[in-house]
Regions:
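C-terminal transmembrane helix-loop-helix hairpin of multi-pass membrane proteins
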Residues: 195-203, 210-217, 228-253, 324-482
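Structural signature of hydrophobic alpha-helical transmembrane segments
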Residues: 122, 137-151, 208-222, 273-290, ...
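Alpha-helical membrane-inserting segments
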Residues: 133-134, 138, 154-163, 179, ...
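Conserved mixed alpha/beta catalytic, RNA-binding, or beta-rich assembly cores of soluble enzyme
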Residues: 128, 148-168, 172-181, 292, ...
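Hydrophobic alpha-helical transmembrane segments
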Residues: 124-125, 145-150, 171-175, 214, ...
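Generic multipass alpha-helical transmembrane bundles of integral membrane proteins
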Residues: 219-227, 247-334
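Core alpha-helical transmembrane segments of integral membrane proteins
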Residues: 116-198, 206-229, 305
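Soluble N-terminal domains of membrane-associated systems
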Residues: 1-106, 110-112
Length: 482
């Protein structure tokens, strides 16, 4: 292999990985997809060493004749599930249809340059109604749902506008949280101020006027990085997972400061401390709110439009299962009364198991359906309530306990959601791993035959035979153990 061609292949491999990292793929998926790209590019896995980090990817190729090390910076971090799906599909298509390097590079360029599937205002409206769906899950009425959505839409649009003017990302988060909370407070006056209520029609007066303040800034909560952080830590990618966690913490902290400043202005802080989050709705209302939240947040994640109904169904499954297990007679609801932690685990697991089959119907990675489906369960309010408790400490007995209680509840719920999403897929992926390897090997052999390259049955049989020996060894180990 010529040095120029080898360097070109390494560049393409790094570009494949950087597209995934900048689109918020978890580290395991990045490595799996890069290894599949290596197979297409004809790079021997024995000579390749990959290093994946939040800001940089590195690949080293060392054989008897060459030793090259190349780097690729990852700077434009965002969330694009459509990009993840396209890159995954490209690596399979490139092998099956025997792409040239030029074709593969053009396909990467097309994916990189493709516009997002939703306009900024569509994303703002979707994210705003998603916050309204959260508000329903916290017990608000449908009038408050629309007030919360309106405040969130305007706050979110401001959040997207400020970085285009050169504003720091975390400052933009704080400002947008401040504005959204003030707007929600202004709508609450319509239902609490007697003078305003006198001139308002009854359908515009909410019986839960303060609930929109609780949910209006939840468009900021970074649900995908939270889940990826837990997944990376569980998979052993500690460094990348830790960076994701710190970035998430800074975003939530900026949001908490924005809300704290808004509280100083409006003088109302019950939504950040004592306002109840226990809903008392019918399950059909939970289902509608979950579908709205799942589809709304999917616009933020740039999901393919055709998957919006699928994600809506996933959100309904996740939230309704969670609520049935979480709620119960102790809080005046129908359910098993087992708590938020167990409910979150059950809801995420139910969706993950369903998507194991459904992903083959829609030809997308598992992550592209499960993550938007479980986002409506992310405990964003508990997260910023925990940080707000620490920000507002005055030395009163019990303040640390309140903050730690919210922090622990939020952490356990997030861990359980990530476990519910990851574990069923992990077991299934290991179950079919040999099948996928055989499929990939067969495609590579067929590709070589089409190109007129000589493929000996012995070369293929060595790998298959090694697989059979491994299975026999496993069976022998089990028999010996028994």
């Amino acid at each position: 292999m010529a040095e120029t061609e080898l360097c070109h292949k390494l560049d393409l491999l790094l570009r494949t990985g950087s597209l995934l990292m900048e689109s918020a793929a978890d580290t395991s998926r990045i490595l799996r997809t890069m290894k599949r790209a290596m197979a297409f590019l004809g790079l021997d896995e024995r000579y390749i060493h990959l290093y994946v980090n939040w800001n940089v990817l590195m690949v080293n190729y060392s054989d008897e004749l060459h030793s090259f090390t190349k780097f690729q910076r990852c700077e434009r971090h965002g969330i694009s599930l459509a990009t993840i799906a396209k890159v995954s599909r490209l690596t399979w298509t490139a092998i099956r249809e025997d792409f040239s390097l030029v074709q593969y590079e053009k396909a990467l360029d097309d994916i990189h340059d493709a516009p997002r599937g939703f306009t900024p205002w569509q994303v703002a409206i979707g994210g705003g109604f998603a916050c309204g769906g959260f508000c329903i899950q916290f017990g608000c009425d449908w009038t408050a749902f629309f007030y919360c959505s309106l405040a969130a839409i305007l706050g979110f649009r401001l959040r997207m506008f400020l970085p285009t003017m050169g504003c720091n990302n975390y400052v933009a988060i704080g400002i947008s949280a401040f504005v959204a909370t003030l707007l929600a407070w202004a709508t609450a006056l319509l239902s609490t101020d007697p003078a305003m209520m006198a001139g308002m029609p009854s359908w515009m007066i909410s019986t839960t006027p303060w609930h929109p303040l609780m949910a209006c800034a939840l468009f900021i909560v970074p649900g995908v990085p939270l889940i990826n952080f837990v997944s990376d830590m569980l998979d052993g990618y500690i460094e990348t997972g830790f960076i994701r966690a710190v970035n998430t913490l800074l975003m939530v902290l900026a949001m908490a400061f924005g809300i704290a400043f808004a509280i100083k202005v409006c003088g109302i802080d019950n939504f950040a401390k004592t306002l109840t989050m226990t809903p008392h709705h019918e399950y059909w209302e939970y289902a509608i709110a979950a579908a709205v939240s799942a589809m709304g947040f999917s616009t933020i994640f740039n999901i393919p439009r055709r998957l919006l109904p699928v994600v809506a169904v996933g959100g309904i499954i996740a939230v309704c299962v969670r609520n049935f297990i979480n709620l119960g007679p102790s809080n005046g609801n129908l359910g098993l009364d087992m708590g938020l932690t167990i409910g979150s685990l059950a809801g995420a697991t139910a969706v993950s198991i369903a998507v194991i089959k459904a992903r083959h119907w829609f030809h997308v990675p598992h992550q592209c359906i499960t993550i938007p489906s479980v986002i409506p369960m992310i405990p964003g309010v508990l997260m910023y309530r925990a940080l707000f408790a620490f920000i507002e400490m005055h030395g009163v007995v019990g303040e640390v306990t309140v903050g730690m209680n919210n922090a622990i509840k939020a952490s356990l719920a997030i861990i359980c959601i990530a476990l519910g999403v990851a574990v069923p897929n992990l077991f299934f992926r290991r179950f079919i791993e040999d099948t996928r390897k055989r499929k990939l090997l067969a495609m590579l052999v067929e590709r070589k035959k089409r190109n007129g390259e000589f493929v000996t049955p012995h070369a293929v049989g060595v790998r298959q035979g090694a697989h059979r020996r491994t299975r026999k060894e496993k069976k022998h180990a089990r028999d010996t153990h028994e």
